Amino acid sequence: MKRHRASSGKRGETADGGRVKRPTKSHNQQGPTSQKRGTVGKGDKRAQKRKLVTQAVRREDEEHEDSSSAGEKGHSKKVKLSSAKVESWQPLSESSRKFLESVMDSGILSILCQQSKGKEDVQKHLNLLKERVLRVFKTLKVPLGKLSNLNNVLSFQVAQKQMLEMNETALVQLQEEINEAEKSAERTEETILRLQHDIQVLKSQLEEEEKKARKLCREGDTKELHLPELPKCSLQAPTLQEEILMVKNQKGLLEDMNTIQQSADMRNMLTFIEKIYEKVDLV
């Protein structure tokens, strides 16, 4: 009985060195050969699982090393692809193309918001580039395993729509600022035109004044004064001496004249006349 128990304990060991629980009375009826076959099958499955896991880990490590080395070398490493892998690639989906188009639109709007001059030329150039890229996307084939980052296209589109709305509001504000700047530029241009007209009028007036001044200078050089002619009545009128002789009370007239000459008003007038003569001589 003791030997039988020892041999049954050895039979309970599996191929990978593990132990199996002792069977119950109901399982003992099947016999020792069926127990051995069950333990061997379980060990093979576990070994296969370990092998698959190790292969998957190695594959992931190799892909990580390839991607890291390509990033360090500036994506200069060439990866050889088999024809079977390339044939399994499929064209880019419509949702992915729409998402990429929305990304390009938001990028174009952000560039135009930052641009201060030549916006029309920049916009035309960017739109041409976008059309060329979209044409390439229609025939572009991509691997299926590399599209995991585009699974959440809807959420990305919502975010891009929000960004587009923000860019549109910024464009509206920018357009209002442009309109205000155009109005101020028009007002400035009107002011400039009015000032130019005033300058032309002042120039014409200055030319007329210069002509008059040159004419007076020429007349001053000849030392001839073009004075208006005296009226004939002034030439035919009697002189002051004749009028004085015609006065009967000449003695009283002389006294009045002496009084006038000695008065302060008369002296001031004589001084004024002398100064006028001095200035005329200087001219």
Curated annotation (Swiss-Prot):
Gene Ontology biological process terms in this record: metaphase chromosome alignment; positive regulation of protein localization to kinetochore
Coiled coil region boundaries: 159-224
Region (Disordered): 1-87
Subcellular location per the Swiss-Prot or TrEMBL entry: Nucleus; Chromosome, Centromere
GO cellular component: chromosome, centromeric region; nucleus
InterPro entries: CAD_CENP-Q (IPR025212)
Biased composition (Polar residues): 26-37
UniProt KW keywords: Centromere, Chromosome, Coiled coil, Nucleus
Composition bias type Basic and acidic residues, residue spans: 10-19
Function field: Probable component of a centromeric complex involved in assembly of kinetochore proteins, mitotic progression and chromosome segregation. May play an important role in chromosome congression and in the recruitment of CENP-O complex (which comprises CENPO, CENPP, CENPQ and CENPU), CENPE and PLK1 to the kinetochores.
Family statement drawn from the similarity comment of this UniProt entry: Belongs to the CENP-Q/OKP1 family.
Protein name, as recorded: Centromere protein Q
Lineage of origin: Eukaryota, Metazoa, Chordata, Craniata, Vertebrata
